[in-house]
Amino acid sequence: MKTILIPVDFSETSSNAIKYATDLSRDAAVKKIILLKSFYTSVYEQILPTPDFLQLSADDIETERQEIESQLTFLGQKLQNRCGETIEVETTISNEPVLRAIYQVIQDKHPDLLIVGSDATGEVSMIGEQIIEIAKSSPVKVLIIPANSVYKRIEQAVVPCDFEAVARLGLLQGLNNSHGWLNPKLMILYVDPKKKHIGREDEYEAAVKQLVNCYECKLYYSEDKNVVKGILDFAGGNNVQLIIALPGRHSFFYNLTHSSITDALSFNARLPVLILK
């Protein structure tokens, strides 16, 4: 893994994502970390008064931009001091909205991984508010860092799987080569509240071993009707450091409604979620 992109908004949420990335970089072959700040001022903000009936002038907007540039430069220098000389830290400001800014940097810089923080209960950050849209629209892998998450070396990871999408387990092939830090024991968790797996365990196990033969892995089952609760309960009881979400409409992540994903991310206060692409 050569390059990590982290969108920032100077909140506690993004600060924790940066700290996690810093600690992660000690276990990974990271060469560059890019900090991205969106400074988008809509036409309406430029022509309409604020709630205090103040009209923003071009000078006001430029002053705010300079302040943000100063904050971002300081944040970049602080990160560089923590990472040392082996990792290049780059800062960039975009005049585009967050989603478009992220997409443009991905197109220009080709990062291997996008790291974003999810908000703690009671906190609302600009990045955290858009985390679902960011995760779904990103063309590169996304690592979501809960507000209370502290980096631990990834030794065990759970991969929730609906066997309608069993072929997507093949995306795990080679992941341990492209991400030097990611070579855990895999727990493939078949989320099956309707108990369709009963009597077909051997068939499913053979399919898993064929598709995920580059990892030490084992197949487990969850019959909890609350899919998210079943996954998090399993992870909490098995010393897991990471949840890996497969892409596609049968993924546990993408198959949830917007509100369900929000609830899941809020409930999951500890474990990072890696969303494959």
Q: Which role fits each region the language model picked out?
A:
Residues M1-L56, Q156-Y221, V240, N268:
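Small/aliphatic-rich secondary-structure junction motif
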Residues M1-N16, D112-L171, F267-K277:
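Intrinsically disordered or low-complexity boundary/linker segments at protein termini
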Residues R26, Q107-D108, K136, G180, ...:
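Solvent-exposed polar/charged
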Residues K37, S118, Y190, L246-G248, ...:
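Short secondary-structure boundary segments
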Residues Y40, Q77-L114, N213-I243, P247-I261, ...:
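Structural beta-alpha unit
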Residues Q55-S70:
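A short acidic, glycine-rich active-site loop
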Residues G128-Q130, Q173, D202-E205, T257-T262:
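Charged helix-capping and loop-helix junction motifs
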